[in-house]
Amino acid sequence: MSDQFEVSGTNTAALFTMKLHRGDGMALVAMNWKKGKPPQDFVGFAIEYKEPNGDKFFALKNRLAFAGMDGSVNPNQLSTRLSPIQKFRWVHFPRNAELAGDFTYTVTPVFMNAKDELSYGEPQQAAIQLRRETYPGKLNVTFTRGFVSSQAFVDKYGADAIPKLLPANADGGLDFVPTLPNAQDALAWMGFEARSAILEVLDQAIADKNARVRLVVYDFNLPELLSRLKQLKGRLKMIIDDSGTHKPKTSAETQAFDQLNTLLGAANIKRQHMGNLQHNKMIVVDGPKAQAAVVGSTNHSWRGFYVQNNNAIILRGKSPVKICMQAFDDYQAHDDVAGFSKTTSANWNDLGLGGIDARIDFSPRSAKNAVLKTIGDDVGKTTSSLFFSLAFLYQTPGPMQDAIKKLQADDQIFSYGISDHPVKGLDVAKPNGKVVLVSPKELSKNLPQPFKAEPTGGGGVRMHHKFVVIDFDKPTARVYMGSFNFSGAADTSNGENLLLMRDRRIAVSYMIEAVRIFDHYEFRIVQADAKQAKKTLQLKKPPRKPAEKAWFEEDYVNARKIRDRELFS
């Protein structure tokens, strides 16, 4: 029914509003009460959905339940018609999100009387198209799952699955074979759409016998990628980073180089680190049938695909392929900052995607065409909301940190942010509730019933995104993303890709990704603090005593939660 990226329910008889936001592989369902606060007997929302061309609705399930008669914790996940969602928004991952057509959502308010009996109010319903590609045939935003530290992973594969799914160290990655019986199912779940889309591009390149293929990689230790590249003999050229731990003969990157050098010939593969790192993650396919370019933050490694929060954008068509091919040629011709920064690749280039305002440029740049300050200035022009997920923000002082810290003082700006480490000067929770930052955490202590201990995913970075979403809810919405760390080194020393997209559909997708990560880790940060941690997590029944408060009370008195409730619905 609708190709819109935001759709609202239209039932005027319902006591609440409902708005659907399209994400990539997910949907954000947001609600708000129309007049004042809900009644005290309101205990949450039941959410159900129907797939395109389906004939039945499926209720979302809730891990939390009401306490039993004796106060016991129910360990079972129940339908939200029995265990309603006690939040004003929810990010849903449909089982078959790639299906074409309308996904129909029905949201129903749930009430509880003095006998603990449930009843249901007038529902809201709306339909939205999720489908696989953000802009079919032009641009696709993709994400990894990034949630090995989650209850969903533990439920599906067990808390001890990681050693059976991932190599103990990066250098052994090329020879590692998972031993978990359902490993392929697990890897597909962990890698999510980013993994499937990247592998699809390489498979299309293999099938198109006249396609030329170019890769620039940083981390590289995935056998499923190496085996595909070996099928591209005579058509593949490649650049592999040789900085730091990538340089020794024992590194996976050197092992891959040695194998491919023998196959491709020295003229077609090289090592490089520019001024510091060749930090790109770029694939380009130029053929009669397949024309695609892959950019973003997703490293071609076990951790990049299966542990970290990452994103990749798949660009389709002659124009983006030509631009990215030129960037490869410029990297191949210049190992130095001075040489590369003079090329057209080190400036903004319109991707020519027809109806999508999207530009790309590549690092390293000179001081004259550096972009970090202008990005910081643009962040400073935020008028409504800022969402960011920035790895290494804690160790990159400069325009980006300065701009975000300045926004903390502005009560009119709503912001959620994620970094891989806490950032000095950016608070996890501000008294005014407007700007909040979280970092990755797993449930390993202070476990609340009915939750189980979660794996860490091994040592190293878990949150690896590099994106900023400015004013997603305005016509001026824009997204910066890429391999670019929003640091001085990324700007003028490293090899990097950076995109600027002024497009609301894309901005909404990245906003939802930021929200789902923020929610995931905010709860875990609270539980890690013994003073704040809850021993049990259960749904709240209506207030029965004068001192008791309804579950939604905070959503109407906490400044951040008020803004959250109003912004998304």
What are these model-predicted stretches?
Residues 2-184, 199, 207-212, 226-307, ...:
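PLD/PLD-like phosphodiesterase catalytic module centered on the HKD motif
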Residues 170-192, 348-366:
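Acidic/glycine-enriched edge-of-secondary-structure segments
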Residues 191-201, 363-377, 395-402:
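A Trp-anchored, charged/polar loop motif used as the substrate-binding/catalytic surface
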Residues 335-378, 382:
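A charged, amphipathic alpha-helical module
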